[in-house]
Design a protein with these regions (language model features):
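Hydrophobic alpha-helix immediately C-terminal to the catalytic Tyr-X-X-X-Lys motif of short-chain
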Residues: 181, 185, 189, 219, ...
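Hydrophobic "lid"/C-terminal helical patch
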Residues: 19, 247-254, 278-281
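Conserved sequence/active-site signature of Rossmann-fold short-chain dehydrogenase/reductase
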Residues: 81, 154-155, 205-207, 236, ...
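N-terminal Rossmann-like NAD(P)+-binding domain of SDR-like oxidoreductases, especially those catalyzing
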Residues: 1-201
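Short aromatic-enriched loop/helix-cap "lid" or pocket-rim segments at secondary-structure transitions
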Residues: 43-48, 158-161, 210-213, 244, ...
Length: 283
């Protein structure tokens, strides 16, 4: 059986690590190469802080998963916007797919830095695509799919109960704006470089080892510690999506021929108010 390699940028992150752990359990997986700059965006002095990066690939009880982590994952500490780093990795391992999850997390939205968001969503994307294009021109290697993890924040305010992929995109925050710009770069590159892509738009991901201070994590920790659940914007609706469902859907879209050069919302498909989420936690 032919073994396939996969590169996961931001592979120590919440979504990237979940995708990686699913990939390494596939029989045809050779190596999963994680490229991550090991940056911690959360203040370690905050009461909610736990460095889940250390837990995502350690203290694993599942023996098969633990064995595969030790045998199939290669870690690189580096900046995905660095041409030399990414070119060297991509040329060496010639991955079947690149899962580009690296970006400044949404937690930074309260203190936005435009250049930081641009580097996370745009500069890294351009650099990786540049490297892939150059390697393909110099060899017989052809990448199977470039998977770009975008965000439902590209839509801005939801005008309907459920968002569809071809709905208007009017992001309100710099995060969504940069993610949307990244999408257009991926599509533009594909037109002249013939790099097949899949764009994924997650929404309100939650689950084990989330440390990005999303509202789901914040309220859950409050509930565990018998704290008061303070709700702001109680009528605001979010399409909460379990991270393992998101990872599974992303991998299926990446491996399916019908997912080539397509964009997918991977969400639960219906909104739930933050207040109703809090009531569930109180039970």
């Amino acid at each position: 059986m032919k073994k396939n390699n996969y590169v996961i940028t931001g592979g120590l992150g919440f979504i990237g690590s979940t995708i990686t752990k699913m990939l390494i359990n596939k029989r045809d997986t050779g190596k999963c190469i994680i490229v991550d700059n090991y940056t911690n965006y959360i203040n370690p002095l905050r009461w909610t802080f736990t460095d889940y990066r250390k837990l995502r690939f350690t203290n694993i009880k599942d023996k098969k998963l633990k064995k595969n982590i030790n045998n199939k994952i290669i870690f690189y500490r580096g900046d995905c916007a660095d041409f030399k780093i990414m070119y060297t990795i991509l040329e060496k391992y010639k991955p079947k797919c690149v899962f580009h999850t690296a970006a400044v997390p949404v937690a930074k939205i309260e203190n936005p830095n435009v250049s930081e968001f641009r580097k996370g969503s745009i500069d890294t994307t351009i650099n990786i695509l540049d490297c892939l294009d150059l390697i393909q021109k110099k060899s017989k290697y052809k990448i199977g799919r470039f998977v770009y993890i975008s965000s439902s924040m590209v839509y801005g305010d939801f005008l309907k109960k459920q968002a569809f992929e071809d709905d208007s995109r009017r992001p309100k925050e710099i995060y969504g704006t940069m993610k949307l710009a990244g999408e257009e770069i991926v599509k533009g590159f594909s037109r002249f470089s013939k790099i097949p892509y899949t764009i994924i738009r997650p929404s309100a991901a939650y689950g084990p080892t989330d440390m990005n201070e999303r509202v789901t994590q914040f309220l859950l920790l409050k509930a565990i510690n018998n704290g008061i659940l303070e709700i702001h914007g109680k009528d605001e609706k979010l399409d909460f999506t379990y991270v393992e469902d998101l990872a599974e859907g992303t991998i299926k879209a990446a491996f399916n021929k019908n997912g080539e050069n397509e964009t997918f919302n991977i969400t639960t498909g219906s909104g739930r108010t933050i207040l109703s989420y809090a009531k569930i936690l109180k039970k």
